[in-house]
């Protein structure tokens, strides 16, 4: 829809949902894989030239390229409207797939390291119950 009120409300809903997730201790990371128009064209051509890649191609992709600038404006607006400390966007240069993948993987790793996750503690009472259950399963 072209209605800006529709999109404004949609973006507010997304931001509210992400805030709810973060409030409930869900870590939200968002990645925008920023592909240049030239690289997109190269990838489309490769898909068209290789029969084993035809399944990845949709004719609508070529038509939609005509609206590249409009999409960029919309993406930038969406990123601005939904970026928050509790739900950050990471804009990743994606023309070179291995580099993009490395940046995403490092970001996830750093986030997990900062979270310092650990297995939950098991109470002594529960540990005893589990031992009894294990004993009942032995032959």
Residue ranges and their predicted role:
Residues 71-76, 80-139:
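NTP-dependent small-molecule kinase module
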Residues 20-24, 81-84:
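Arginine/glycine-rich "motif VI" loop of SF2 helicases in the C-terminal RecA-like domain
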